Amino acid sequence: KFIIQNRTPFMQSFLYWANVSVHANNDYQVQFPPNTVYGTSHSKTQYTNWPVTAVGDQELDTSWWKNWKGSNSTFAVNYSDDFLSGYDFGADAGTIHFANHHVVPGKKFFLWGTESVWNEMLTEEDGAYLELMVGTYSDNQPDYSWIGPNEVRSTTQYWYPIKGIGGAKEATLEAAVNLERISPSSMMVGFNVTEKYNNARVLVKEGDKVLYEGRTDIAPDTFWKKE
C-alpha cells in the first residue's frame, strides 16, 4: 500500500513508480495487456508499434529481452487495463502486477542491455535482470502529479507469481488467464489463482457457443491448463 501526504500549506509535485526486478534471459518476455498496440519513450517524445516494431533495419518483437542490444525504456500506451505481466518461458513462470488503472495507469519495462558486461557491473554472478515498473498517478517519466495542501492519497498494488500457463492475456486480483491459438482448430486455456477454489467451474465460450465446460480444484500452488 502506498500513502502520500502533503503536510505543507502549498501545492506540491510528486512522482512514484514501483520497480520490481526480474531475472531476464533469452526466454523472457514482457507482456503488456493484449490491446496495447503502441509504446512510447520518456516524456512521450517517440512512439513505436507494440510489440513488433522497427529496430534499425529490422522488424523485431521487442517484447522479448533477447531482441534488445542496448538499454531501453518502453511505456505502454494503455489506459484501460489493470495488469502488467512478464514471463520466463524457460522457467515456465512469471509475475503479475494488478492495480486500479484509474490510479495506477503507468506500465513500463526497463533494461540496461543484454551484453555480459551488465551482469558483471550490476549483479556480479546473478545474471541479467529486467525491471517491470508501474506508475501511480503517472503514466510516464518524468510525468509528475500534484497533491494539494494537507491532502492524503493512497493506493494498493498487488504482485503475484504465475506458472505453467505461458503468461497472461487477462488478470484480476483473484486469477490470471492465458489463451493461445495452437492451430486453426485448437487453442490452449490456462489459469492461475491467488486463493484456493474447490470444484471451480471452468467455462470457455465463443459468443454463445460453449467450447469447454468442466470442474476442477485449483489453488495458488497449482495451475489449470487445457488444450
Map each language-model feature to its residues.
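A contiguous, surface-exposed recognition patch within enzymatic or periplasmic domains that forms
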Residues: 7-152
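Surface beta-strand/loop "capping" patches
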Residues: 165-197
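Short Pro-Gly-centered flexible turn/kink motifs
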Residues: 2, 145-162
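Short, hydrophobic/aromatic beta-strand segments
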Residues: 9-16, 168-169, 199-203
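Asparagine-centered strand-capping/turn motif at beta-strand->loop junctions
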Residues: 3-9, 191-193
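Aromatic sugar-binding surface patches on proteins
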Residues: 218-226
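Short coil/turn motifs at secondary-structure junctions
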Residues: 6-9, 162-163, 207
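Beta-strand-rich binding/interaction modules
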Residues: 186-215
